[in-house]
Amino acid sequence: MKNINIAIDGPAGAGKSTIAKMVSAKLGYIYVDTGALYRTIALYITENNIPDEKIEAALPNADVSLRFIDGTQRVFLGDRDVSGLIRTPEISMAASHTSAIPAVRAYLFGTQQKIAAENNVIMDGRDIGTVVLPNADVKIFLTASAEERANRRYKELAEKPDCPTYQEILDDIIKRDYQDMHRETAPLKQAEDAVLVDTTHLNLEESAEAIVKVINDKIGRAE
């Protein structure tokens, strides 16, 4: 029996990872955070001071892997769990640049497709429905206004030391949106057959339920 693949794409800060995890828990599917893979490559490149022209040759030594521990995705560089290290603003910006490099996308492409072929998955990223899983059973484009995304991120970081200002976060989101939408390789865009879910005025539970309804409607009709 064919495994069910759900693709969730959208801009930075739209809540893709959090909402996709909630949806996967409701449906019993494996959640795959592809952004974590790109962030890990960015961390590897940053830690080793690898210039762009040498990245392709260095990729086979990166040894990036996903492991599912107690139902939770963890990402590793070799035997080192770097799941926490890849969530800094610096690595976020580095990942936006790194993910535009064709060699990096090609390196991770096979990993993502293999996981999807072997499991019922909910996979989120920037080009899942358009490039990685073009034949996904259901495609969602999850978005929210830049201002709302910045506000959510600011609330997340407010209690942490050296928290950036709301305006700095908003500027960063606008910059990342531009980079992601205008890169030459696999730019961020909504797949023609994707369902748009705008969460600007929805909380997390409402967003997850909206997506579950779309999935159940589409999978039910297909069956």
Give, region by region, the residue ranges found by the protein language model.
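Hydrophobic anchor at the beta1->P-loop junction of P-loop NTPases
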Residues: 8
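Residue-level signal for inorganic ion chemistry
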Residues: 35, 79, 108, 122, ...
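Small-molecule kinase domains that catalyze NTP-dependent phosphoryl transfer to phosphate-bearing small molecules
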Residues: 67-69, 112-118, 126, 131, ...
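ATP-dependent NMP and nucleoside kinases share a basic, alpha-helical "lid"
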Residues: 83-86, 90-95, 99-160
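Conserved lysine of the Walker
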Residues: 16
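N-terminal phosphate/diphosphate-binding loop that engages ATP/GTP or pyrophosphate donors
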Residues: 25-89
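The conserved Walker
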Residues: 12
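Hydrophobic positions on the alpha1 helix immediately C-terminal to the Walker A/P-loop
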Residues: 19
